[in-house]
């Protein structure tokens, strides 16, 4: 088995600086996979699937009007803008990509000016935010990038008020399954350290001040993203296209790769 690197926040930020535009092109403006209700017959567009994934996270977060919500790994702001406008909340989005901040601030300038949205550079493992300053948080495919997940979850817990919810959507690896060489190119391309199991993530949450309320594995419902990536790889061509297609093939065939929707409460 090849050794999996432990990317730093700087490494992850550089990757997103370079690949965000491609990712948002693939995923209809979002930087997360979609949720297909019928993965065996995925006729839904990537637009509908990514919006449904956002809704799955939102339904578990249950924000109320006037609340201040933290978006951990905000990408270019599409998820934050959607939630802020539909639920009358204010959102602070953090990312380690300067390019993402620039795009988010420009795209949602009107919402930024009204104070509904704020985008800033911040590492979740060292959050420069005040204690108990948020009413909820969500993290969509961002915890997976962090080389110290305990530190990240501890920091998120610190900035949440007691009783607040944390809604997570992320990749996991089945318990006892070694991280296979088959997805080594995925780890390298997307700057992801060794994956952990859903049970390990729940354990970390419990140890860092959360009570897990729900955790469901929806791995089959995200599988069609591999076809989307393969198609984009054909369109892009070159080395990038070849890598995208290779990643898609590796992920599609890896049954041990899970994807969870989890919600926890700050105790």
UniProtKB/Swiss-Prot annotation:
Cross-referenced InterPro entries: Erg6_SMT_methyltransf (IPR050447), MeTfrase_dom (IPR020803), Methyltransf_11 (IPR013216), SAM-dependent_MTases_sf (IPR029063)
GO molecular function: S-adenosylmethionine-dependent methyltransferase activity
Binding site for S-adenosyl-L-methionine: 100, 145
The entry's keywords: Methyltransferase, S-adenosyl-L-methionine, Transferase
Leader sequence residues: none
BP GO annotations: methylation
Record flagged with keyword Methyltransferase: yes
Biological pathway: Antifungal biosynthesis
CDD domains assigned to the protein according to its UniProt record, in alphabetical order: AdoMet_MTases (cd02440)
Pfam families (UniProt xref): Methyltransf_11
Enzyme Commission designation: 2.1.1.-
Superkingdom to which the source organism belongs: Eukaryota
Family: Belongs to the methyltransferase superfamily.
PANTHER family: GERANYL DIPHOSPHATE 2-C-METHYLTRANSFERASE, ZGC:194242
Cited function: O-methyltransferase; part of the gene cluster that mediates the biosynthesis of the tetrahydropyranyl antifungal agent lanomycin that acts as an inhibitor of CYP51 and blocks the ergosterol biosynthesis.
Protein name according to UniProt: O-methyltransferase
Species annotation: Pyrenophora dematioidea (Helminthosporium dematioideum)
């Amino acid at each position: 088995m090849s050794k999996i690197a432990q990317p730093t926040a700087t490494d992850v930020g550089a990757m997103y600086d370079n690949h965000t535009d491609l990712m948002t092109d693939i995923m209809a403006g979002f930087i997360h996979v979609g949720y297909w209700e019928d993965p065996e017959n995925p006729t839904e567009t990537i637009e509908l699937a990514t919006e449904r994934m956002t809704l799955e996270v939102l339904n578990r977060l249950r924000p109320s009007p006037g609340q201040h919500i933290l978006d951990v790994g905000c990408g270019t702001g599409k998820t934050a803008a959607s939630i802020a406008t539909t639920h009358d909340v204010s959102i602070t989005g953090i990312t380690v990509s300067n390019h993402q901040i620039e795009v988010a601030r420009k795209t949602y300038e009107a919402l930024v000016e009204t104070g509904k949205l704020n985008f800033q550079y911040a590492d979740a493992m060292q959050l420069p935010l005040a204690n108990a300053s948020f009413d909820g948080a969500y993290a969509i495919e961002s915890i997976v990038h962090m080389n110290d997940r305990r530190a990240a979850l501890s920091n998120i817990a610190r900035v949440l008020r007691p009783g607040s919810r944390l809604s997570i959507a992320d990749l996991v690896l089945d318990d006892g399954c070694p991280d296979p060489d088959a997805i080594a190119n995925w780890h390298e391309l997307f700057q992801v350290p060794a994956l952990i199991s859903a049970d390990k993530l729940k354990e970390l949450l419990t140890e860092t001040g959360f009570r897990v309320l729900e955790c469901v594995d929806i791995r089959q419902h995200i599988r069609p993203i591999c076809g989307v990536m393969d198609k984009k790889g054909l369109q892009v061509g070159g080395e990038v296209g070849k890598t995208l297609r290779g990643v898609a093939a590796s992920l599609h065939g890896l049954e041990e790769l899970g994807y969870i929707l989890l919600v926890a409460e700050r105790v």
